[in-house]
Amino acid sequence: VDRSDEEFEAFLVEVLSDFQITIPEIGTVKAKKVPFVVLTSNRTRELHDALKRRCLYLWIDYPTFEKEMDIVGSRVPDAQEELARQICGFMQLLRSRDFYKKPGVAETIDWALALMSMGSKDLDPAVVDSTLGCILKYKEDIEKIQEDGIPQVIEKAKMLRERISRQTAK
């Protein structure tokens, strides 16, 4: 909803407050039943207070390592488990960093598909470097990873995966 213009936001306020819409050529149309409306926001701009007052909020955090593994397994079923583990561990590590835009699950899936199409069996530094654009959308974020050294970031992701595996095994 935050990507819509102010006219559409005003339209939503009318729908959510009065359960009706006014169309100049037709008139006012009222809902026979109270509608169930789901709005999503990426927080690209601030919404008006009038609209926020009419909404309940559910913040959805990034998935856990295990949940992301399940998602990759269902969306990219041909991915080998070890590659999927490496990808998910790498993504979990990236999300712990201070980036302009942290990668979401869509980027995880896109990256897994890209790596598979390249025939990758594991996260090789050269392949990771050439595919960072799949997961990080800003040049400054890509440069942060490159400055840290991709082999070192891969190693940190491996240590994170191992720590997560030990914790879930308990």
Task: Tell where the protein language model's regions lie, with residue ranges.
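C-terminal regulatory/interaction module of P-loop NTP-utilizing enzymes
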Residues: 1-170
